Amino acid sequence: TQRNRIPICDELCQRLPSTGLILEIASGSGEHGVTFQKRFPTLTWQCSDPDPEHCRSIDSWIRHEQLSPKMPAALQLDVRDANWQDQLSMPAQAVVAINLLHISAWECTLALLRQSAQLLQAGGKLCVYGPFCVDGQHVSESNHCFDASLRARNPAWGVRDQTTVLHQASEAGFAVQTITLMPANNRMITWIR
C-alpha cells in the first residue's frame, strides 16, 4: 500500500478535476484515502468499503490526520449496491477504485462499471488501478505468479484482462481516456463518461 501511494497520487493529479467529490470504492484501511485528501485539499475524498471494520479504520485515520469535517466519514457501500448516489452528500465528479478488480469476483468489476456510469454525469471520470493482463497474456512472470496465487486463495479472484474490461466499460457508456503504465507492472486506466 505504502509504496504505490505516491505514483498513484501523481497520476490522479493529472486525471481528476480540481474541485468536487471523489468517491473511492473499496477503500480498505483508509490509508490511501487520507493521503489523497491531504494531497488534493480542494477535493472532497469520500471513502467507502463494504466491511464495517474497514469503515471504522477509515474513520480512525480521518480523526488521526485531523481531516474532519473536510473529509466525510466512510460509507459502508458494496460495489454491487444499487443507487450509490442515495448515499452521497453531493454528486460525484469521479470514481476511483484501487486494487479492487483482481481481489473481487468478476461481477464486482461489472457492477463498478455499471454503477459508476449511473452515478457520473457527462464528463465524469472513472479511474481504476491495479494489475492487468493484455489480450489474455500476463505482462510479466510476477503478474502470472500473482494471478495464480489469487486464484488459489479464491477461484473468483484473478488479474483481469484489460481488453475485456475496456470492452465492458465501453458497453457501460465510458470512453477510455488514458492507460498509464505504473510501477510494479500495474496500470491506471481512466475513462470519461
Each predicted region: which residue ranges?
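Conserved alpha-helix/loop element of class I SAM-dependent methyltransferases that forms part
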Residues: Q2-T19
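Conserved S-adenosyl-L-methionine
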Residues: A26
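A short, conserved alpha-helix within the catalytic core of class I
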Residues: I103-S116
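Conserved beta-strand signature within the Rossmann-like core of class I S-adenosyl-L-methionine
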Residues: G123-F132
